[in-house]
């Protein structure tokens, strides 16, 4: 997770009656652990960076478990709140992600050793994710909770895979094609297993020479998958070409536009977003709105404009249940998203900051009130 405000990527799913509501919890709001009080109920189960359960939903907070969360570098949690009784947040994706995360070290090791079975295992691990994304229902995707912990390779690969799947769904991919995209995105950085760990984990900015070494990882990834065999060209090209840029200034081959595989063009957007959203030793992470603007600004240069447009229509900036401050001096909670307006949700206001007092709740649709903007996440 990240340390500052507006931290994490989040996915909230508004599910139709045709989809199981397993994992959907009511009465939830997002709270920074630094502001977490005792005697409140955890609304969503919390996992560590190895995918292990730390605190189960329904647990009451205490000084001890709050300290435990801080020790495990958890910075944001969801707690129950009756003011948001009609706002449902789905945590099924967390379980799917956790199950996949547990398998990732074994999958990468087996791939590097040429074990064909590991490729099938990787596909099987993504099946639940693809089934989830392909399910019927309206999907509202917020840029807050894909990334639950500080950046490391396995988390980054899974988050990139999740984002890529949602983009693929927006682009009309069927389930079979989504599975191929998912495996390509999941394995896009497998070539980093051939790069020295001290370079991958360096606590500082890379030198020019070190960056040249790092740039070999797409080629190493292609070699690993070619040696494995049995994977389609689109899957391999997604791994090999994910650092190519739409204008031809990327690497390793300097491809441009449609010469870059569509899988790679999708993965490129997701890879950059998840990478800049992570804290680094040499720079602070981008807030979700900043990372979002970076993707939009790269349209036509770094990224395929048509995919950026799909990105814009697919991902929202502020999560359901987030407490936000508005430019008119009022604060409240995000209760609904507005499609095609990712930074202008519907907010249920509850507090007058200027007067320093609660107010009778009412809702503001920021699409209709263009003179009001979100100025921060509280």
Each language-model region and where it sits:
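Short, contiguous strand/loop micro-motifs
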Residues: 51-54, 151, 208, 250
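Short leucine-rich amphipathic alpha-helices used at interfaces
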Residues: 37, 43-44, 142, 148-149, ...
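Acidic/His-rich, divalent-metal-binding segments that scaffold phosphate/diphosphate chemistry
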Residues: 82-215, 220-234
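Short alpha-helical linear motifs
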Residues: 146-149, 201-209, 239, 259-263, ...
């Amino acid at each position: 997770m990240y340390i500052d405000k507006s931290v994490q990527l989040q996915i909230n799913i508004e599910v139709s009656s045709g989809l199981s509501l397993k994992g959907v919890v009511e009465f939830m709001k997002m709270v920074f652990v630094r502001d977490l009080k005792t005697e409140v109920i955890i609304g969503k189960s919390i996992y560590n960076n190895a995918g292990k359960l730390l605190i189960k939903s329904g647990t009451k907070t205490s000084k001890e478990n709050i300290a435990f969360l801080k020790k495990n570098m958890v910075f944001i949690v969801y707690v129950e709140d009756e003011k948001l009784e009609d706002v449902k947040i789905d945590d099924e994706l967390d379980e799917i992600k956790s199950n996949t995360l547990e398998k990732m070290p074994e999958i990468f090791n087996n791939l590097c050793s040429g074990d064909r079975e590991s490729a099938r295992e990787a596909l099987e691990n993504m099946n639940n994710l693809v089934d989830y994304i392909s399910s019927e229902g309206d999907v509202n995707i917020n840029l807050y909770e894909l990334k639950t912990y500080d950046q490391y390779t396995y988390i980054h690969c899974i988050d990139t895979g999740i984002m890529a799947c949602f983009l693929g769904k927006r682009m009309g991919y069927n389930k079979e094609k989504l599975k191929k995209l998912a495996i390509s995105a999941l394995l896009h950085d497998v070539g980093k297993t051939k790069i020295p760990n001290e370079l991958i984990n360096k606590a500082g900015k890379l030198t020019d020479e070190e960056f040249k070494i790092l740039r070999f990882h797409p080629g190493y990834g292609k070699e690993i998958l070619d040696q494995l065999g049995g994977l389609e060209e689109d899957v391999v090209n997604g791994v090999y070409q994910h650092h190519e840029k739409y204008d031809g200034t990327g690497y390793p081959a300097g491809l441009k536009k449609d010469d870059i595989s569509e899988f790679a063009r999708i993965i490129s957007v997701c890879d950059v977003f998840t990478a800049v959203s992570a804290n680094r030793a040499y720079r602070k992470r981008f807030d979700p709105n900043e990372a979002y603007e970076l993707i939009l600004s790269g349209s036509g240069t770094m990224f395929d404009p048509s995919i950026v447009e799909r990105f814009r229509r697919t991902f929202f900036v502020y999560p359901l249940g987030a407490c936000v401050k508005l430019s008119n001096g009022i604060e409240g909670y995000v209760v609904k998203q507005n499609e095609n307006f990712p930074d202008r949700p519907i907010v249920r206001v509850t507090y007058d900051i200027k007067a320093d007092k609660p107010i009778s709740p009412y809702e503001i649709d920021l699409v209709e009130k263009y003179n009001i903007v979100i100025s921060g996440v509280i």
